[in-house]
């Protein structure tokens, strides 16, 4: 079975400027716009190119994906999933397990605390020590955790964390 890649990407920094806006409808802040583009360029440079993407349907996650996608050479299948908004780690994992079995590289673009909780839960033995330490320290906005594993999506429970990238480490 080929090696699969799972990329857990937290949405970029959002704006709290308009207190009247519902949380679901908050746009990206200026810093978030830059970070999303930076992470997109990093995915392209490392050749971590998704063939499928699950994106929370909140505005800040959709905007993050739009900016990331603009930096990629190809356009993967994208599913906007309301189930990823305010999702727990278990909710996110259940969405991942339903992914098309032919998919080799999946990006899940969502929110904390569920995304960070899932990343910590998935990181099994054989994970890179530096990446694990970063993940334990903080999983800020626009952070990316990359996992590899060689089972089916439907059976995912543990994987090898290879990288934990944060915009401040790249920019």
Put a short name on every predicted segment:
Residues 46-48, 98-104:
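Glycine-rich phosphate-binding loop signature in dinucleotide/nucleotide-binding domains
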Residues 123-160:
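Domain-level recognition of soluble alpha/beta enzyme cores
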Residues 64-68, 92, 118-119:
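Hydrophobic packing residues within well-ordered alpha-helices of enzyme cores
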Residues 2-87, 124-128, 139, 171:
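Active-site-proximal alpha-helix that buttresses catalytic centers in soluble enzyme cores
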Residues 84-101:
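Short phosphate-binding loop-to-helix
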Residues 160-171:
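Short, solvent-exposed aromatic-acidic interface loops
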Residues 104-123:
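A glycine-rich beta-strand to alpha-helix segment
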Residues 6, 105-107, 144:
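Residue-level preference for the first positions of well-ordered beta-strands
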């Amino acid at each position: 079975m080929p090696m699969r890649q799972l990329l857990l990407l937290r949405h970029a920094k959002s704006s709290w400027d308009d207190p009247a806006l519902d949380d679901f409808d908050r746009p990206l802040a200026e810093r978030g716009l830059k970070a999303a583009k930076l992470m997109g360029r990093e995915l392209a440079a490392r050749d971590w190119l998704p063939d499928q993407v699950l994106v929370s349907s909140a505005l800040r996650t959709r905007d993050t994906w739009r900016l990331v996608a603009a930096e990629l050479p190809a356009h993967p299948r994208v599913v906007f999933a309301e189930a990823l908004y305010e999702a727990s780690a278990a909710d996110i994992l259940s969405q991942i397990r339903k992914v098309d079995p032919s998919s080799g590289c999946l990006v899940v673009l969502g929110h904390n605390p569920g995304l960070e909780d899932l990343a910590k839960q998935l990181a099994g033995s054989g994970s890179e020590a530096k990446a694990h330490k970063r993940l334990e320290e903080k999983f800020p906005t626009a952070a990316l955790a990359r996992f590899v594993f060689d089972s089916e999506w439907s059976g995912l429970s543990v994987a090898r964390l290879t990288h934990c990238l944060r915009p401040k480490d790249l920019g």
